[in-house]
Amino acid sequence: MTFKEKVNELITEALLEKPSIFLIDLAVSDSFKISVGLDGDNGVALQDCIDISRAIENNLDREEQDFSLEVASVGVGSPLKLIRQYKKNIGRTLIVTTNNEKIEAELIEANDVFIILSWKAREPKKVGKGKETVQKEQQIPYTEIKEAVVTVTF
């Protein structure tokens, strides 16, 4: 078992006690710097990071392999990677990049196959001059999404 596999196993075991928290990123550098990125259905509390950090640190032997450890919540501007993240962000505005376009819109639905985005657009009137505001919706399969990021509005 590699060092990274061992760390991943320890994280998986620790997360069994915290079903609302899930692993987004795990990186282990050549110099054995462990970086863990977590997310949660209701966010990630500092105590969650501490608990996961302790679960890793207490089960690895620094005599066998010295390492540094960083456990954190993924940032608001981090790309969404799991379907579970899309589902938790329904109702929020996303910037979604696909192969053909970049869309900024509200996420109104997320299931196991695709998401549905909704936004308002100005289009030429069907009759007469000028433009009118119309509501648009687009269904995008996860397989077509290159990147999706939640936008922060103040």
Swiss-Prot record:
It comes from the Bacteria. It is found in: Cytoplasm. The keyword Iron-sulfur does not apply. Pfam families: RimP_N. Coiled coil: none annotated. GO terms for biological process: ribosomal small subunit biogenesis. Keywords: Cytoplasm, Ribosome biogenesis. One of its GO terms (cellular component) is cytoplasm. The keyword Cytoplasm applies. SUPFAM superfamilies: YhbC-like, N-terminal domain. Belongs to the RimP family. Required for maturation of 30S ribosomal subunits. This is Ribosome maturation factor RimP. It comes from Flavobacterium johnsoniae (strain ATCC 17061 / DSM 2064 / JCM 8514 / BCRC 14874 / CCUG 350202 / NBRC 14942 / NCIMB 11054 / UW101). The lineage of its organism: Bacteria, Pseudomonadati, Bacteroidota, Flavobacteriia, Flavobacteriales.
